[in-house]
Amino acid sequence: MSELLSFALFLASVLIYAWKAGRNTWWFAATLTVLGLFVVLNITLFASDYFTGDGINDAVLYTLTNSLTGAGVSKYILPGIGIVLGLTAVFGALGWILRRRRHHPHHFGYSLLALLLALGSVDASPAFRQITELVKSQSRDGDPDFAAYYKEPSKTIPDPKLNLVYIYGESLERTYFDNEAFPDLTPELGALKNEGLDFSHTQQLPGTDYTIAGMVASQCGIPLFAPFEGNASASVSSFFPQNICLGDILKNSGYQNYFVQGANLRFAGKDVFLKSHGFDHLYGSEELKSVVADPHYRNDWGFYDDTVLDEAWKKFEELSRSGQRFSLFTLTVDTHHPDGFISRTCNRKKYDFDGKPNQSFSAVSCSQENIATFINKIKASPWFKDTVIVVSSDHLAMNNTAWKYLNKQDRNNLFFVIRGDKPQQKTLAVKRNTMDNGATVLDILGGDNYLGLGRSSLSGQSMSEIFLNIKEKTLAWKPDIIRLWKFPKEMKEFTIDQQKNMIAFSGSHFRLPLLLRVSDKRVEPLPESEYSAPLRFQLADFAPRDNFVWVDSCYKMAQLWAPELALSTDWCVSQGQLGGQQIVQHVDKTTWKSKTAFKDTVIDMARYKGNVDTLKIVDNDIRYKADSFIFNVAGAPEEVKQFSGISRPESWGRWSNAQLGDEVKIEYKHPLPKKFDLVITAKAYGNNASRPIPVRVGNEEQTLVLGNEVTTTTLHFDNPTDADTLVIVPPEPVSTNEGNILGHSPRKLGIGMVEIKVVEREG
């Protein structure tokens, strides 16, 4: 209803101003600004829905306002371009319509009415309401009843007898199991669900709507609210350090806790969270690559579900035979948005909907088959009688190719339990949420029936039952939950440990690199993660007088304040204010100590603008003083005009990437010397090794041969045509995820470049 009202007010404002208001520059600008805000808000809502499926939620506050750099971002480039072009077209059309009768005399009354209607359209829009609620949740002091509902359980289970297998299905919400809506989509796992305790109304709350947040909610009974963006949790050294979570209780009760997944454990700080709460045995893509049958059988995120669940079964067998009490948690990935992935061993590789194949539904049908196969192996084993199997979604599906069909249904998360010791078949329609999962499992294992804000759905009353406005209540508790991190409020001294790549201050430890906004009563960490913008782009959003401490590679801040460090990959510390003074210090000791030093100086807005503009220069446009192209730092030497076909800097150098161009091209500002030596320090990837690699300057071509290890080769060129471009053509670029950013599409690697130097020859 509010959508229709806001749109009607918007339309009325446009029509009244266009046909009645007449000519007046101020009223035109004011009305266009407010109407433009309405458009931006609704496009933001549309974009947020595209990524989250839940409008402008807590994750969007960080993810969309920082950057979409991260998992699977290439698949969102076209929608992003479409939004920008659409926004430009709408603004142009809006301005043209409002100025249709600009030659008519100005009418104050109609202008005022049009502006008021425009303001009303903004106020009535769902996007404005969602953003307002999010902003309120950031500024609240908390809710006085939090302490009454947050309950810490006993740290042990009195007499544990059952082992636990807990399966997180990536985005595998219960909605997929509606056989009337999606016939024969989940027959294998659906049949198992119907054999156990099936909790049919598990709702999703704020702070539980992405993977690490869903894991925290289900194991600790609290949403993931933090003094930083949740997916940046990989930068912290401990995770809710004061809280008692399910893993802690299991470990204290004699369980060995295991976690197995196909993706990198560092993503979003899963390794930090699990190690902080009782898990001593973790297996991700790095740990599994030496033990899986085919280490090259991977998708954009890591190993496929069939591989991961095969390894989980081996671990279940091994642990069961040992007689040691254990818990085994695993997380699938094949159903990750936007399209999902199909394991090669499943029979259900294709699912048609609305008369055509649907990739997301196909991935769901395949993944549920793999999960069911794993569960049936456990059920057929002699150890099932001592085992509790839990299957849950980590969160509701985000915007995938099945999303519009899911939204037509009543959506809930998946949570069901199969007990080997006490088979029970029942569907429980009690209102509950993800935070109740851990408490329910703890209750089944013989422990307490509460865990944080979670309550057992077998013997307790969920917060979802107690509070009709549970989503608003959860946001009201946000400041209380953030305080559970025990995060420091001041930063006076700090220590950098180069061996551990950590910074420590006021009792807290963070992985590097890190940006901190420091005020009198608050220290706000801004880590760098797969989902966030690079730290220099985040710093560019600071106000002129905001105090900052920025710890990063020296070359990243050198172009601003320390050009002598432009080629250094060591750690440097910069601190100050963008509109005031800044200092850069080179970290030159293994354990390096310093103090914050913020001077209260006059703010120079010209300096501020210059700093912001420099911080926002994209990597490929950065230039530094050097007599060679150094590939392990961003940018290029001043002599280079532009380059293409080259991937991002890594610690050793950069790969060529045929996804960005079939050839490596380096165009110089001026013609290359008439006679010169080209000194190339590089290596080859895969089948490119030991093969001739053409290197061209103008009409002259030389051949480069590289191995898999870095070597230096000198090629001799004559350049009679004054060519200014160097071209290198890898013979067989290989599609691979090796060294790739998690979730990105595979790169096509050819040669790895460390340094290229042009040396003029006499004569």
Curated annotation (Swiss-Prot):
Gene3D superfamilies: Alkaline Phosphatase, subunit A
Pathway(s) where this gene product acts: Glycan metabolism; osmoregulated periplasmic glucan (OPG) biosynthesis
Catalytic function, reaction form: a phosphatidylglycerol + a membrane-derived-oligosaccharide D-glucose = a 1,2-diacyl-sn-glycerol + a membrane-derived-oligosaccharide 6-(glycerophospho)-D-glucose
GO molecular function: phosphatidylglycerol-membrane-oligosaccharide glycerophosphotransferase activity
Main location: membrane
Membrane spanning stretches: 4-19, 26-48, 76-98, 105-127
Cellular component terms per the entry's GO annotation: plasma membrane
Similarity field: Belongs to the OpgB family.
Main function: Transfers a phosphoglycerol residue from phosphatidylglycerol to the membrane-bound nascent glucan backbones.
Entry protein name: Phosphoglycerol transferase I
Organismal lineage: Bacteria, Pseudomonadati, Pseudomonadota, Gammaproteobacteria, Enterobacterales
